[in-house]
């Protein structure tokens, strides 16, 4: 049986109540958060192994019903957003940084997106990408964007519009590439993962 633990560490949490004072107009919870968290850190575990770290300068949670009476829920992250993804061996594999993010929940369906100066890095492969908005399908374990994207790797640069990849950014594919540049390297070159490096560097 798959064991899933989710631990949230909160620094300086402020929560607002849904009640209203007598004589005051009702609060519009579509614009007023029901919860605010400053300096949020979240950790996700699977089978007792750390899989994700998530950090944000500020998180605001909104809960309300739209004009049709449909419940709406979302969390808005601002002040910087970061997700760190780890491999089964505990290595820092993927890093996503952005200006902000949003987590929507509508009729039980989830949607994650990060926006503003999005930087996606795969440290084990030495690859990183730059774009404006990235979407994460947590159930399918995939990420994608429809925006302009630049992808850098030890082999060179590729750029275009639209990208699809697994959530670890290991097999990213640009849907509509229009430009690329290659790098010629000699046979002695190799990629060195300095992020996960432990111990002296050995060359044979």
What are these regions (language model features)?
Residues 1-204:
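Mature-chain termini and adjacent capping regions
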């Amino acid at each position: 049986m798959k064991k899933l633990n989710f631990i949230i560490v909160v620094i300086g949490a402020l929560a607002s109540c849904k009640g209203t004072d007598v004589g005051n107009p009702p609060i519009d919870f579509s614009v007023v958060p029901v919860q605010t968290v400053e300096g949020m850190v979240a950790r996700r575990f699977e089978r007792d192994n750390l899989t994700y770290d998530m950090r944000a300068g500020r998180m605001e949670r909104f809960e309300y019903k739209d004009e049709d009476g449909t419940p709406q829920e979302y969390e808005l992250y601002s002040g910087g957003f970061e997700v760190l993804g780890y491999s089964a061996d505990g290595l820092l594999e993927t890093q996503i940084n952005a200006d902000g993010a949003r987590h929507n929940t509508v009729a039980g369906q989830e949607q994650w997106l990060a926006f503003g100066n999005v930087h996606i890095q795969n440290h084990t492969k030495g690859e990183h990408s730059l774009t404006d908005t990235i979407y994460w399908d947590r159930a399918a374990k995939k990420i994608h964007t429809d925006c302009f994207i630049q992808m850098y790797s030890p082999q060179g640069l590729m750029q275009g519009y639209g990208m699809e990849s697994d959530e670890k950014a290991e097999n990213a594919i640009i849907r509509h590439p229009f430009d690329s540049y290659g790098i010629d390297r000699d046979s002695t070159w190799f990629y060195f993962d300095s992020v996960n490096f432990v111990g002296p560097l050995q060359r044979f």
